[in-house]
Regions:
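Long, non-catalytic architectural segments outside compact domain cores
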Residues: 1-57, 61, 83-110
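Hydrophobic/aromatic side-chain positions at a characteristic register within alpha-helices
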Residues: 66, 70-73
Length: 110
């Protein structure tokens, strides 16, 4: 049996294009939600919570990287880590990516 898993919301794909491992990690949590049997909590809500949780993890990781970069004193590392932390902070807000119709329809219709 082939299962068509949902795709990561387009806005997240766009914003994370330089972080393919992050996209893969988001896809993993969506696949888990899609494969999990129905429960009292709607799948769309579970998918949103799963993405928000993983995005929160990305933010925490980016903060750690920023702290490490600051400790190194290397201006290039600091600038790169600040840019990454800023991006992760931005995408953590669901209004940035929740307008993806394909995502919403997939989880509403499953």
């Amino acid at each position: 049996m082939t299962t068509n898993f949902p795709r990561v919301p387009a806005k997240l794909l766009e914003k994370l294009r330089d972080y393919p491992d992050h996209i893969e990690r988001l896809q993993e949590v969506l696949n888990i939600v899609a494969a999990t049997p129905p429960s009292l909590i709607p799948r769309l809500e579970r998918a949103i919570e799963a993405l928000q949780g993983r995005l929160g993890t990305f933010m925490a990781e980016a903060r750690r990287e920023l702290n490490q970069a600051r400790s190194s004193g290397d201006p290039r590392l600091i600038a790169a880590a600040q840019a990454k932390a800023s991006l992760m902070s931005q995408i953590r807000l669901k209004h940035v990516w929740m307008t993806d119709k394909v995502f919403s329809v997939y989880f509403s219709g499953v």
